[in-house]
Amino acid sequence: MTTVLASRAAIHTETVDYKQGDTTLEGFLAYNDSISGKRPGVLVVHQWFGLTDYEKHRAEMLAQLGYVAFCADIYGKDARPKNVQEAGAQSGKYKSDRMLLRARVNAGLDVLQKNELVDTKRIAAIGYCFGGTTVIELARSGADLNGVVSFHGGLDSPTPADGKNIKCKVLALAGADDPFQNPSDLTAFESEMRDSKVDWQIVFYGGAVHAFTQPDPGFANPGAKYNEKADKRSWEAMKQFFAEIFK
């Protein structure tokens, strides 16, 4: 089921209801209606507050670049955290059940892959914070992707043996001063990538903390703050990565 929301300046957007198991999810699709033919698709995964206007705006930015962008909904249509306690409970539910997390994000990927405008041989996934963790799990699930980009996502490695399932290139964009990024997690992540012979990169932005791409991270904490320079640089890094993987 789709509901048309807007079609301004050739950017078409709509909400898309879909399911994973018995759970109804509500995603968001954006593409440039003035472009004909198939084009690369990009899955966008939300931060811990769930699918918000922030991710929808990123999807529209991707559509302006010529991609079909689909924002996945991990939590469910009726699950929209209103505060940090609810956000923590929702994100924690999926971080503690990686198989469920993988099932939810793969359901969103399936919607994107089935879109008639998408070139299924050219698909990537990006995610922010919780979503950054999620796209790494998507890669670990063995999903058929060209690449994933994690923006200030947690880089823990709970199942390092699953690194061997990764078929795509991996780009992690992180704040060098992010207090939520555990150094031991980084070490484990790097070992997993090396041992699994993944084509991977990590870029650190000096002076940037957690949530550096989000003007309003949704909670007051000096360890989570917008950094305009890191935001712009990381977006450009993503664009360069896409130019490489979508050749």
Roles of regions detected by a PLM:
Residues 105-166:
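Primarily recognizes the serine-hydrolase "nucleophile elbow" in alpha/beta-hydrolase
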Residues 15-117, 213-225:
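Serine-hydrolase catalytic machinery in alpha/beta-hydrolase-like enzymes
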Residues 58, 182-193, 201:
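Short alpha-helix in the alpha/beta-hydrolase fold that links the catalytic acid
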Residues 177-181, 210:
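Acidic catalytic loop of the alpha/beta-hydrolase fold
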Residues 194-247:
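C-terminal catalytic histidine-bearing segment of alpha/beta-hydrolase fold enzymes
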Residues 166, 172-174:
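Short beta-strand/loop motif that positions the catalytic acidic residue
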Residues 6-11:
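Boundary at the C-terminal end of the N-terminal hydrophobic targeting segment
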Residues 67, 74, 153, 205-207:
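Active-site loop/turn elements of alpha/beta-hydrolase fold enzymes
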